[in-house]
């Protein structure tokens, strides 16, 4: 395989010395970029973009043409797994993802089978291969999946939800059915991420977008337990390198100690967590990724730069920090402001790294 020209993202994940703090953005290939909107229009719709490996590759690389990012992330959607299970994913303008079929009963759960990524999601596997080839060693490629709990919420609700009423009804009234659903999803995530790794992903992230909606005990039983199972089932080394695993629970700051015990390489932090306190708690066990409020990108470039400086200072000296937003970049952000953010990370972080 082509050697990496820039491996600081992988080095920081392993808490090895770097010259500057690496940076990438969740949803860095997205609607804030005019070139993304043009490619999406050519694809016809969002699913047309996701299911075309060449176009998925094109939009994955677009932010790297604009910005000195330290990683690329596969362009896809977390809901590909339930779609592959036959639920019929579609998107309604202004309403987000929906499924033609929801999972509401024990019979619905029992009918689900663990996916076969090469057969059921060949467009994802082919997109990873295509992106990796086109990157040609420029930066590492991140693969990803949704967490079992997060996938389950969409499957049970039939789409997005504010209160997760149906999902919580199943969780509390039929916990054994919920566990069965989460188990088939965990097994599916394992084979899905391993397929991405074999196709060329050099690190993977598990997005637990809705873990923070759970109570303290329910989070451990219905979300964290399954992410720990996934981490244990992943390919640990590929192409002669360790394959780092990033766990990101939005709203999960109170569970960092338990998350660090899963065997994950790094934990994603949202912007409600104090990164200095997080490093003091778990920084000797895991790298940390985050955690600027995406809303700051609406402010002036000077204010963005100041906030980057604040977060770098809070993390402090040494490696083990991957700079990111605390959640995905939003569609209305000025691309120039995103550029100011990325440049500020590299400009201001060198002082915190004595070896490179």
Curated annotation (Swiss-Prot):
Its main location: cytoplasm. InterPro entries: UROD/MetE-like_sf, Uroporphyrinogen_deCO2ase_HemE, Uroporphyrinogen_deCOase. Its EC number is 4.1.1.37. It is found in: Cytoplasm. GO terms for molecular function: uroporphyrinogen decarboxylase activity. It is an enzyme of class 4 (lyase). It catalyses: uroporphyrinogen III + 4 H(+) = coproporphyrinogen III + 4 CO2. It holds the Pfam family URO-D. SUPFAM superfamilies: UROD/MetE-like. Catalyzes the decarboxylation of four acetate groups of uroporphyrinogen-III to yield coproporphyrinogen-III. NCBIfam families: hemE. This is Uroporphyrinogen decarboxylase. It comes from Cellvibrio japonicus (strain Ueda107) (Pseudomonas fluorescens subsp. cellulosa). The lineage of its organism: Bacteria, Pseudomonadati, Pseudomonadota, Gammaproteobacteria, Cellvibrionales. The gene is hemE.
């Amino acid at each position: 395989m082509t050697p990496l020209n820039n491996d600081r993202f992988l080095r920081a994940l392993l808490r090895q010395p770097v010259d500057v703090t690496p940076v990438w953005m969740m949803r860095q290939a997205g609607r804030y970029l005019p070139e993304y909107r043009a490619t999406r229009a050519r694809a016809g719709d969002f699913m047309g973009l996701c299911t075309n490996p060449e176009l998925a590759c094109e939009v994955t690389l677009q932010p790297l043409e604009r910005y000195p990012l330290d990683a690329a992330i596969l362009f896809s959607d977390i809901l590909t797994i339930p779609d592959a299970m036959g639920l019929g994913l579609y998107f309604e303008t202004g309403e987000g993802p929906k499924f033609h079929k929801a999972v509401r009963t024990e019979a619905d759960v029992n009918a689900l089978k663990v996916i076969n990524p090469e057969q059921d999601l060949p467009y994802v596997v082919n997109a990873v291969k295509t992106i990796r080839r086109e990157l040609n060693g420029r930066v590492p490629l991140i693969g990803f999946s949704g967490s079992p709990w997060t996938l389950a919420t969409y499957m049970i609700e039939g789409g997005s939800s504010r209160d997760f009423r149906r999902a919580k009804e199943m969780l509390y009234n039929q916990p054994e059915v919920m566990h069965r659903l989460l188990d088939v999803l965990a097994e599916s995530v394992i084979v899905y991420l391993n397929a991405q790794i074999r196709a060329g992903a050099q690190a993977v992230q598990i997005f637990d977008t809705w873990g923070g909606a759970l109570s303290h005990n329910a989070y451990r039983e219905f979300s964290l337990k399954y992410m720990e199972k996934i981490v244990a089932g992943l390919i640990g080394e590929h192409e002669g390198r360790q394959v780092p695993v990033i766990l990101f629970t939005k709203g999960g700051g109170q569970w960092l100690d338990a998350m660090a015990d899963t065997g994950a390489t790094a934990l994603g932090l949202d912007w409600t967590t104090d990164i200095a306190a997080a490093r003091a708690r778990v920084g000797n066990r895991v790298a940390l990724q985050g955690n600027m409020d995406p809303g700051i990108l609406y402010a002036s470039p000077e204010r963005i730069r100041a906030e980057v400086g604040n977060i770098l200072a809070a993390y402090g000296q040494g490696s083990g920090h991957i700079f990111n937003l605390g959640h995905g970049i939003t569609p209305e952000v000025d691309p120039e402001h995103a550029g100011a953010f990325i440049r500020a990370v590299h400009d201001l972080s060198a002082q915190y790294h004595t070896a490179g």
